[in-house]
Every structure is written in C-alpha cells, then in structure tokens.
C-alpha cells in the first residue's frame, strides 16, 4: 500500500490525519505498558482516512505492529506479519475470531453483539484493502 489517499483528501488533511493516528497508536501502546522509542518509517503505511499501520521499536528494543484509523487501535508482535499488507490480513482474521467469540458468549448482551458486528465490518474492510493490488504496487 502506498502512502496515498482518495483524491478528495488534501495533503494537509492527510498529514494531520496520519499524525493523529500515530498519536492514537502510541497512546494505545502506552495504555498497554509499551513505550515507543522510534518508528520504522519505511515499513509504515496509511490510507487516509481508513487505516494506518505503524511498525514501532520500543524502548526495550522490541518491535510491534500497530494499527489505527477507522478501525480499533490494536497491536501485535512484529513476527506475526512480514509487512503491512500481511498485517491487514492478520488483524482481519483476529477480529473475525474475536467477533465470533463475542457472539458465542454474549447471547443477551446487545453492546457485545454490536461490537462483534463492528469488528466483522472492519475486518471485511481490511480484507478489501489488502486485496486491492493497485494500493500495493
């Protein structure tokens, strides 16, 4: 995926969106006890305003992939995906499994059922982005 967005998104809007998503990704890591040191910029990708993928080096020298955007902020160890495109597939599958588990355990909990539907919707979106060859050329 190249660092592009749809034509109607201005460069300034795209830049602001990417900065906001980077901050959101860092906040998510910090809330999970992971402290950011640097970014592996050549492996990061974003498609404003849909999804941003960041490869982060932590203060203790570990690497993580982080996803943000119009999706749940989430992260995983860098070993789980070789690149940003594979990472979209990883999170799409992970969120589908999480949604299935939520549906199975939250029979009468409308909030959990709605969140499961949200995860399913976002995972389908990630699959579509991953499959668009023109984004990855």
Language-model-derived ranges and their functions:
Residues 2-46, 134-137:
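Negatively charged, low-complexity tracts enriched in Asp/Glu with abundant Ser/Thr
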Residues 42-56, 108-137:
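A cross-kingdom feature marking charged/low-complexity
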Residues 1-13, 103-114:
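Charged, low-complexity surface segments at secondary-structure and domain boundaries
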């Amino acid at each position: 995926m190249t660092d592009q967005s749809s034509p109607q998104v201005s460069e300034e809007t795209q830049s602001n969106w990417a900065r906001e998503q980077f901050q959101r990704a860092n906040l998510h890591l910090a809330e999970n006890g992971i402290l950011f040191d640097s970014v592996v910029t050549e492996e990061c990708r974003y498609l404003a305003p849909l999804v941003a993928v960041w490869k982060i080096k932590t203060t203790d020298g570990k690497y993580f992939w982080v996803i943000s955007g119009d999706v749940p902020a989430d992260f995983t160890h860098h070993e789980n995906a070789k690149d940003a495109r594979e990472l979209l597939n990883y999170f799409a599958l992970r969120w589908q499994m999480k949604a299935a588990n939520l549906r199975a355990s939250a029979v009468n909990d409308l909030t959990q059922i709605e969140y499961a539907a949200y995860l399913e919707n976002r995972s389908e979106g990630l699959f579509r982005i991953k499959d668009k060859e023109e984004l990855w050329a």
